[in-house]
């Protein structure tokens, strides 16, 4: 843990970040920077007004308070020089990465072929041919049918990931032919998120961003409320995250009214 008395001291911040990068403990590094909200604007500095009332009307005051030039969109020469050099460093790093990636592809052709399949999904018609058909009068819980459907789909989509908020035993979306993703098995396709619906949905967003994996996650429908902010960001970002919500009946009984999703579907605007 590092504590910076002046969180506005950019040199001190950079020094702390570089120190954290060099840490060998293998543990997360925390930097606590003491700052003043709205610094440089006397009318709002150090008050809650600094959050939403800063606005353009204080721009000139802020420039003077922070000793910045009056010029709009001003970029100092040291910043220009730094980023020009940074661009060169990025190009060198990318060149090294391309060589390493080419060597990896040559050494692991099977894994490279799997990576190339990212984003190349089978058609819906093809997947429909693989999933089981159920009699119309089958006395089968929807989640049990979902369990039987996800297995062949997971075979056809080797980059599909299935997670649950500590409810795999109830949501039944576990990929039976695979194992858990964990420290000693990074190839596992089942993620155990714990009772953390928001974290589950947010992590699924992160997994989806690079377009390689197709994440799915599951919990009871009533707990969609906990994951809704992350779901909203997924919609805004057009991320193809799959949400599986079971126990969707208002007749869910043994857990009582806290688990009955009376208004949840309307809230999700499904």
Predicted regions and their residues:
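Glycine-rich ThDP/TPP pyrophosphate-binding loop and its adjacent helix/strand module
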Residues: 1-85, 256, 261-265, 269-270
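Thiamine diphosphate
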Residues: 3, 80-81, 85-270
């Amino acid at each position: 843990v590092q504590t910076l008395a002046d969180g506005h001291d950019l040199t001190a911040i950079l020094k702390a970040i570089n120190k954290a990068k060099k840490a060998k403990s293998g543990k997360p590094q925390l930097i606590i920077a003491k700052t003043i909200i709205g610094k440089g604007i006397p009318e709002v500095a150090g008050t809650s007004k600094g959050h939403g009332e800063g606005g353009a009307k204080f721009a000139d005051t802020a420039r003077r308070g922070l000793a910045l030039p009056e010029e709009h969109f001003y970029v100092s020469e040291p910043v220009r020089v730094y980023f020009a050099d940074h661009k060169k460093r990025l190009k060198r790093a990318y060149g090294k990465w391309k060589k390493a990636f080419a060597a990896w592809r040559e050494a692991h052709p099977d894994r490279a072929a799997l990576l190339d399949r990212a984003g190349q999904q089978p058609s819906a018609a093809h997947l429909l041919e693989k999933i089981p058909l159920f009699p119309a009068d089958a006395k089968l819980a929807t989640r049990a049918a979902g369990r039987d459907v996800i297995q062949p789909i997971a075979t056809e989509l080797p980059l599909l990931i299935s997670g649950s908020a500590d409810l795999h035993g109830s949501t039944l979306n576990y990929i039976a032919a695979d194992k858990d993703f964990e420290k000693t098995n990074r190839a596992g396709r089942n993620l155990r998120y714990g009772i953390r619906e928001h974290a589950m949905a947010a992590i699924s967003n992160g997994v989806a961003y690079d377009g390689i994996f197709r994440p799915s996650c599951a919990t009871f429908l009533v707990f969609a409320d906990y994951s809704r902010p992350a779901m909203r960001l997924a919609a805004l970002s057009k991320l193809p995250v799959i949400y599986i919500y079971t126990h969707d009946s208002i007749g869910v009984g043994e857990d009582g009214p806290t688990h009955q999703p009376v208004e949840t579907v309307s809230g999700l605007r499904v």
